[in-house]
């Protein structure tokens, strides 16, 4: 039988930003609803993708995403080994907007954790995601795919440097106090900046982040005041609606550059129509990313080789998984036969003898199962299973 994994999703490669916003799943309400609709599954929802992984038929997952206003042309559906290969490419950073970025690996790990918490995983999904996480670590430790600073946050900084060149005299406002904001501030601090203004719904979180980077902290009510002082705004807050609109940016003498790396977006796209405001979003970062990719392009074949090895390892595990009951029965049968042949032997000797007897049968059983992955059930497996019960 075929590997029954499936994947239904959309990403920056297939859907524009406004469509990805509709499909994004917040962890409090929408994510549990998605897992409930799937029955068993894992949901990976990031700023650049929403993907539903499960076992069996992909139709429920497809219907769920269509119900959120996603057009069929924006979706991709992969099944069997191709679904697993895609997951491995995602975890390794090959399918990211910023190839080689490390943040996606933590997001894959978090997706598995949330599915476990909902009781939505099962053995094939568990193994797939655990092996994907292990592969992602190997890709970054054994190749140069992640060399240098590679992340959406770094791409945002790269864009800021392209615009301003020197950041030392600027006031930079950061909306949000999460992982993306922290990453951006880490890169920003390394390049030197005049003034850092951190704005967050929870002022205590803004204070903690500002203290780390020598900045000033503000609650959300102070946002209009902060915008008047800023030269550059980087938005990465987790918010269900726009935090900055055209009405928040009265005409000013000097231009304001805004980079929105949040999903859903923090900044109303109409802000980009203002004569004194220059707005960039996630899709705009792709040009920056394409330039950075050239430095890591030579590492991609090395990562792809690791992926193919990991696929082989998974399919070997799956071959054993498919026939685990038969293997257990063979092992029990071998113990009985060993006891009959050596009635005077002790437990250790009997266990070794049973292992020697069962080993070639188990290898053959796994090999035949592996040969049939993607095809019909193996009649020899069924025969061996029946024989092992005698």
Swiss-Prot record:
Enumerate the residues marked as the site Important for activity. Answer: 86
Residue numbers binding substrate: 46-49, 96, 101-103, 107
- Transmembrane residue ranges: none
Q: Where does NADP(+) bind?
A: 176-181
Catalyses: (S)-4-amino-5-oxopentanoate + tRNA(Glu) + NADP(+) = L-glutamyl-tRNA(Glu) + NADPH + H(+)
Asked if the record carries the keyword NADP, the reply is yes
Q: From the UniProt record, give one GO term of the biological process aspect.
A: protoporphyrinogen IX biosynthetic process from glutamate
Q: Which InterPro entries match?
A: 4pyrrol_synth_GluRdtase (IPR000343), 4pyrrol_synth_GluRdtase_N (IPR015895), GluRdtase_CS (IPR018214), GluRdtase_N_sf (IPR036343), NAD(P)-bd_dom_sf (IPR036291), Shikm_DH/Glu-tRNA_Rdtase (IPR006151)
Keyword field = NADP, Oxidoreductase, Porphyrin biosynthesis
**In the UniProt entry, which residues are flagged as the active site?**
47 (nucleophile)
E.C. code: 1.2.1.70
Q: Does the keyword Signal apply?
A: no
Organism's domain of life? Bacteria
GO MF terms here are: glutamyl-tRNA reductase activity; NADP binding
Q: What biological function has been recorded for the protein in this entry? A: Catalyzes the NADPH-dependent reduction of glutamyl-tRNA(Glu) to glutamate 1-semialdehyde (GSA).
Q: Give the family this protein belongs to, as stated in its UniProt record.
A: Belongs to the glutamyl-tRNA reductase family.
Q: What's the domain remark here? A: Possesses an unusual extended V-shaped dimeric structure with each monomer consisting of three distinct domains arranged along a curved 'spinal' alpha-helix. The N-terminal catalytic domain specifically recognizes the glutamate moiety of the substrate. The second domain is the NADPH-binding domain, and the third C-terminal domain is responsible for dimerization.
Subunit structure, per the record?
Homodimer.
The record makes one more remark, namely:
During catalysis, the active site Cys acts as a nucleophile attacking the alpha-carbonyl group of tRNA-bound glutamate with the formation of a thioester intermediate between enzyme and glutamate, and the concomitant release of tRNA(Glu). The thioester intermediate is finally reduced by direct hydride transfer from NADPH, to form the product GSA.
Name of the protein in question: Glutamyl-tRNA reductase
- Gene encoding the protein: hemA
